[in-house]
């Protein structure tokens, strides 16, 4: 292995070594805001109270799993500065039914990281659209002003416990 930059810029992966994240299974995923800033709302009377960005995040979660038939959302929780998902990546050739109980085909599962990057991107795009539409004087999210922390935290759920 080459010692480019003396490993100064190397970021260690927190993924499970030798695990294929495109394999079917159950995954517990956590996405965190950059700087752990409370972008999504606040806790009041032991309940999460979404702000406008939190509502956008909630809508995008629902939409993401409506369009991604290869994934099944078991549970999710939006907190002020992070989101927890319990996601099942379906086996190939599983029959899925639409809202009218009609069987539909779905594409072979992609990886969990594909879902995470797509979800993060769609949230940023929707939030930026909201900033424009509401004519709010706050900076849009970009590389210099990120909404999300890099990467995500995951646990592979290996049993029902």
Question: What do these predicted regions represent?
Answer:
Residues 1-161:
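Short catalytic/metal-binding and nucleic-acid-binding patches
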